[in-house]
Amino acid sequence: MKRIGTASSAGLLVLIVSGIGIVFVDQRGSASPTSQQHLGCAQRAETSAPTVFHDSERRGRATTVLIGPLELRGVRSYRSPRVFSQLGKRRGYYIAKVALVVQARRSVRLRVSGKRPDSVLLAYGSAEAGSNELLIDSCAATTRARTRPGFVGSGTLFTGVFELTAAQCVNMVVSDRATPGTWRTRLPFGRKCLS
């Protein structure tokens, strides 16, 4: 591998490497965010029982946000400035763990935006770098579980994090890739979302 050139523009350093192509590196030292990630049934997480989508009996539902065919479990716990300020940081981003549960047999696109294009990213599955867009294909409810007897359930669980540069209001758009359905919400991370 031989480095054959560099260019710099708007805080982004471009390394041109023979045999590899182009690698983008942020001048702060971290890789630039990818434009989108894809998660499928194989990248799911599992619990000791089938995952139930929009379970009204589940403990912790007070911290859950439902947006169309998607549940964000634990996201409301980060609206407090005190809780948000205690989050750990990685590569200059606060790390907020939020479980995604997608209704069975759905194909959805999830997009987030904040104060700046890279101020909020999603890192789910085995992603090394965050992205502002996820494409998610959930399992059928009758998909066999890998870690226990039985089936996946009416929701497919994905674990990961929101990466945020600062406390902010995050805009989220969820769209069903098979139908014209689109849902929008604003998520408070360490501050209130004003109308």
Predicted stretch roles:
Residues L12-I20:
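Hydrophobic core
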